[in-house]
A protein has these predicted regions:
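C-terminal output helix
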Residues: 98-99, 119-131
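Hydrophobic/aromatic residues positioned on beta-strands within the core alpha/beta folds
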Residues: 91-94
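Active-site residues of response regulator receiver
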Residues: 20, 65
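Acidic catalytic/metal-coordinating carboxylates
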Residues: 46, 72-78
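The feature encodes the CheY-like receiver
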Residues: 69
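Acidic, metal-coordinating helix/loop segments flanking the phosphotransfer/catalytic sites
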Residues: 43-61
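Two-component/phosphorelay signaling modules centered on CheY-like receiver
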Residues: 23-42
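Conserved phosphotransfer cores of two-component systems
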Residues: 55-57, 79-86, 109
């Protein structure tokens, strides 16, 4: 079966990777994603660990904070693009709208499929709309 065939299968679970350095936000995101329906959820506090996960298996959706220690969200997105990530990207940050939109534009210029750029805290409706669930 081709690698993308499982993702196209109606019975396949949506795979989501959430990268944020806030433990509480990761748990809130887990609950919000679970409320969207069955999915495989991976949570990462560290961008390098998240890149290792991407290198092992590409998720369908990547939810990424922009402000991270050691490697910021932009650097992470550049690395994800260089790995060939082709799934949806949702950006999260407490930064100003202009900064988030500039990051989204940069991610799109890298070939990433940004489906949302939201200010923290993310509302459940925003997540559902971005994921179409």
């Amino acid at each position: 079966m081709p690698p993308d065939a499982a993702a196209d299968s109606p019975s396949a679970l949506m795979r989501v990777l959430v990268l944020d350095d806030d433990h509480l936000l990761l748990e809130v995101m887990r609950e919000m994603l679970a409320a969207c329906g069955p999915c495989e959820i991976a949570l990462e506090l560290d961008a390098r660990q998240a890149l290792a996960r991407l290198d092992e298996a590409m998720p369908d959706v990547l939810i990424c904070d922009l402000v991270l220690p050691e490697m910021d969200g932009i650097e992470f997105l550049q690395a994800a693009a260089s790995l060939g990530y082709a799934g949806k990207v949702i950006l999260l940050s407490a930064l100003e709208d202009e900064v988030r939109e500039a990051a989204a534009d940069l991610a799109r210029a890298l070939g990433l499929r940004v489906v949302g750029s939201f200010r923290k805290p993310l509302a459940p409706e925003q997540l559902r709309d971005a994921l179409e669930c």
